[in-house]
């Protein structure tokens, strides 16, 4: 009887993001640009850490795994959302929905665990520097990462198998842009008590456990930093942990506000917007947050990119680029309003790494600024391209 009920539902309808009427093409261009920047930035970090011998250390090994997890995490939801926007057919099969749940939980939990491992790595490096080489040896580092992969794969599989046994009778509209676990539980006409019990026990342990590990690690780090006598050593310790703290705050802040502290007044649309922060924005910002103050990583990122530069070139920020692209970057830089130091650092970093990537980011920014403009999307995109390329 349960299988008969399940056979009634062969696909779900994803409502997607709450876009204004006539603005879907604009949102498509925006999220496509953000997704391309996410993939490019994270894969550059993986390439740099794999090819540069100076980056063969536990810290960069964990960072490369975090970048891989971010690429897969973003690719679990964003391509399907873009395909639905492009085809205007927001349908996902039952099997596709279960697959999306599995990989979403797998790579989301993997992000969570690797952030905890990176916090422990920073703790050993700052609080126990003399034993760092023996404690964080290559074998132990690899074992920690493999353990993270195995635990998250098993956890995601348990949730997916429990979801597969549920029945969905008539309701098949998912008020989200991807198959969210909690949303599907509300649509089921079966008893979901076992699913909710596993979410509370295992899900809570997999989320709160690594978070507590990060808090404990940074509590010891802060006490150790306060005892540093020199200002230079203090500044170096803070800069080493600052990027990781920024990523942790962004990742856990959005998840805690959405899942652990749900507001009764929050609408479904607001929940979808918050979900964009940890599915799209966090994987996008991770490579930039980790690279802004890391000279070794910046130099490693430049080396493989130089292989793609041919012909008559000149240097921009240490990276050789073609003259036409460099002129485009200079024109775009002159048109940007550098009102804050943070924005200035991000823009200079993009110019330093890849001017083409810089143009994509500026294009995304201008699309977001004109998000609610009444202009025709095709005309607006053409206007924005002209505005970026010509001073």
Regions found by a protein language model. Give the residues of each.
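Transmembrane helical core of 7TM receptor-like proteins
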Residues: 1-355, 362-365, 371-381, 385-391
